[in-house]
UniProtKB/Swiss-Prot annotation:
The gene is ruvC. Belongs to the RuvC family. Its cofactor is Mg(2+). This is Crossover junction endodeoxyribonuclease RuvC. One of its GO terms (molecular function) is DNA binding. NCBIfam families: ruvC. The active site is at D9, E74, D146. It comes from Methylobacillus flagellatus (strain ATCC 51484 / DSM 6875 / VKM B-1610 / KT).
């Protein structure tokens, strides 16, 4: 059975999305990108409600274009700055709203769970996540950081959040808790 998974890495300025297809234990890249709510110069577009609408509308368009059957989104972590955490939570809420409005089932994973599933340890650096996403999906180059995180979230969901043990049965070699 083949189905598509939409992974989302929520952010108020940049929201990453990634769509993969799962057929049995095999994963295939479909699409990825970044939703930007800033101008090219890093300044904010309009006000907060407008930025949230951009996230909601853009994800609705992604869903219409790629027709995923399931979605996975990264959970919010509590930042040192409470204001940043609240803003991230609002961006995440806009993303979840887009998924709910389209009737998609949603799975939520912490960044630690996603990294553990894709890289083999929960405290992996961004470049390690990018490299593993590239390898697991046979991409020609490294995906951008926000897209890589979203694709990693989708990969985590595809493997049931079970980590490298599941990957080992899919034909990848695991040694010392790491994919080789």
């Amino acid at each position: 059975m083949t189905f598509r998974i939409l992974g989302i890495d929520p952010g108020l300025r940049l929201t990453g999305f990634g769509v993969i297809e799962k057929t049995g234990e095999k994963l295939a890249y479909v699409a990825s990108g970044t939703i930007k709510t800033t101008t090219g110069k890093g300044s904010e577009i309009e006000d907060l409600p407008t930025r949230l609408k951009i996230i909601l509308d853009s994800l609705a368009e992604v869903i219409d274009n790629y027709q995923p059957q399931q979605a996975a989104i990264e959970k919010v972590f509590v930042n040192v700055n409470p204001q940043s955490t609240l803003l991230l939570g609002q961006a995440r809420g806009a993303a979840i709203s887009a998924l709910v409005l389209q009737g998609l089932p949603i799975a939520e994973y912490t960044a630690l769970q996603v990294k553990q599933s894709v890289v083999g340890h929960g405290h992996a650096a961004k470049d390690q996540v990018q490299e593993m996403v590239k390898r697991l999906l046979n991409l020609p180059g490294l995906p951008r950081p926000d897209s890589a995180d979203a694709l990693a979230c989708a990969i985590c969901h595809a493997h049931g959040g079970q980590g490298l043990g599941k990957l080992a049965t899919a034909g990848f070699r695991v040694k010392g808790g790491r994919l080789i």
